[in-house]
Structures are given as C-alpha cells and as structure tokens.
Amino acid sequence: MSAVSDAIRCAGVPREQGFAQGRASREALRERCVAPGARARAQDALGLLDSASARWLRDLRRHFPHQGEWLEGAARGAGLALPALVRAARASQGDPPRVLVACEGEGVARIGCALPPHTVLRRMVPEGRFRTLELALPWLPAPWLGVNEAGLAVAATSGARAGAPCAAPGMLFARDCLERFESVGSALAWCLGRPAAPGASLLFADAEGELAGVDLAAGDRRVRRPEHGVLVLGVDAARAAAIEKRLAEASRDALAFAQALGADAGECAGADAAARRLLLAGEEIAL
C-alpha cells in the first residue's frame, strides 16, 4: 500500500486523471496487465477483446462514461493497450468482497473497510466536481474507500453477476457519488436509479451524521440502515451479526474496526465524513 507521502495526484478531466494514475503506477500496472504469450500481446495491440470483456467495456462507456475515459487515460499513462487494462479491471470483480463497516455516535458517522493488496492512495481533483481523497487499486477508476470535500464518504465492495442486463460493476457508483454529491440521500437516489450489474454493496456517510448502505442484489436493490448504530455489508448474515456485536461493545475507532474484521490494523482503513479525512495505518490523512 502507498505511504501517505506517496499519494498520487490525479487532476483535470477524466482522461488526464487516468493518465496521471497510469504514469505513477506504470510498473504495477504492467506487472498486473501484460498478457503472457506473443499471440495474446498481439491481440491486445490490435485492440481485440473477448466478447465478455467487450460487453463490459461497452456498458461501462455507456453508463459510466467518465470512468471509461479514465481507463483510456490510465492505459496510455502506463504504456499499455486498453484491452490489457480492461481485463485486469474486469478480473477484480471476482476478488473476495471487501467487508464494509459503518458506525454512528455523538452525531459523527464513520465508515471503514478491509483493503486488498496493491491499494494506492490518490488525491482526485476533477475539473468542475468535488475533490476527493481515495484508496483504490491502480487499475480501477473507482475506489474502495473515499471522502470528498463536501463531506460525503463512500466504501464499496467488488462483485458483478454474469449474465445481467448491464455488465458494468456497481462499485463504479463510488466514483460517481464522490464526484457529484454531498449527502447520503442524493447518493442513494443515484445508485437506485441507474443501471449496473448486481453483486456489489456500497456504504455512505455524510457530514450531517447520516449513514446508509445499498445492496445491489440480483432481484432488487435494498437500502440498509444501521441498527444499534452499526451497519455491516459485504458478508453473510451470521458474520455481519458477529461484527456488529463486537463493534457495539467496542470504542469504534480504527483499531476496533480492524479487530472486529479479524484483520491487521494496517489492512483496514476508515473515513470520517465530517472531518473530510481518511484513517490509515494509525495516521489521519486530511483532504
């Protein structure tokens, strides 16, 4: 994971943001994305995608156009063919879901999650939209965890069911909402009303202390609210109940999050919506 001092600054229009990420993470992206074998590399150079990846990219460009442009910029910045980056981004949908946790108390809402390897810290400065501080994989346009200058914090899990009408993953809503909104209500309305593949979950907190989550299930989309001040998404009901119980009895700080998730504190991060900051490895990182 990137050190705080190594935060990547991605500014401008989406292609420029992606280019900055691709250039800064060139080595990691090439290690992850370059296909083995001369034939596969030749297909990448020709822009050829298998049918499932082509559909994924088509739906992403249609329903999340800024993130499609981001991918194009990241590929150029890393010196990669776009198909190679698309394959890596699409493959991340099959990663184990991140556990998402939200806690409220004394008018303050915090969210947190476990982080996968290779996560980087980046400062997004989009043209004409909210600035954000994010933890993300360098081959994905949307973060696992982020907070914006308006006081909205978002956490997301991976996951997308094959064969759904829309192939673009729901975790991409995290980037959309951070750029656009300052309240949980506005973010929920966006996620409930736009196409995306089922399978992901998202958590939201805002500076007014509101907390909510949404499960993008196969049959419908369910809004979730905290019970007893705690909300857990991304795991089955039994584990969620166990985590909620641990947090209900704990201080609800970053260490408590990690202990409840059964992870090392360095593998977890939190976001404080009101303070516009991320909490990572014992450090508070201000926007």
Describe each model-derived feature in a short phrase.
Residues 171-179:
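Short histidine-centered catalytic/ligand-binding loop motif
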Residues 25, 44, 62-172, 197-201:
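A contiguous strand-loop segment
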Residues 1-99, 103, 179-287:
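C-terminus-biased signal that marks the final domain/tail of proteins
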